[in-house]
Design a protein with these regions (language model features):
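N-terminal amphipathic/basic leader segments beginning at the initiator methionine
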Residues: 1-20
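Mg2+-dependent prenyl diphosphate-binding active-site environment of isoprenoid biosynthetic enzymes
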Residues: 23-154
Length: 154
């Protein structure tokens, strides 16, 4: 099972890189946007999503865009959480706000959050509009639950 989870994580990471913009302003935005996704991580959330989809009879490729969206949003929340908690490190390297300052880190975190919507919308091509909207509804509900939980923690 571990090898399968690792495979799903690698599958997700490869697709995620396709959604990271390679354009200007690199130094002040897009290099920062890519910083957390490029760091080593377990990719547990997207891997479990793909494994769950497979358990219900879907192909891994059917769940891939949603897995990418989850990982992008997770990284966005990590950027903001590190600022809120004044964390020095993330995944063995300086946290983004320590590396680039709070304003640029907030902006990069926002961009990561916005980027998550494109793979969700790209689901229309493979899953159709009805299922895509259901997934989007669930994703939005989960995002709100996460920020509400963070509000309680703060």
């Amino acid at each position: 099972m571990r090898s399968r989870i690792a495979q799903y994580g690698a599958f997700t990471r490869d697709r995620l890189y396709e959604y990271l913009p390679d354009q200007e302003p690199r130094e002040y935005l897009y290099d920062l946007v890519a910083a957390y996704p490029q760091r080593s991580s377990s990719m547990l959330r997207p891997s479990l999503l793909i494994a769950s989809a497979r358990a219900f009879g879907a192909q891994a490729s059917d769940a891939l865009n949603t897995a990418v969206a989850i990982e992008l949003m997770h990284n966005a929340m990590l950027v903001h959480d590190d600022i809120e908690d004044i964390s020095e490190l993330r995944r063995g390297a300086p946290s983004l706000h320590r590396r680039a300052g709070v304003p640029l880190a907030v902006n990069a975190g926002d961009a990561l959050g916005f980027l998550c919507f494109q793979p969700l919308l790209d689901n229309v091509a493979t899953l159709g509009p009805f299922l895509t909207l259901k997934i989007l509804e669930e994703a939005l509900e989960t995002m709100f639950q996460a920020v509400e939980g963070q509000a309680w923690e703060l």
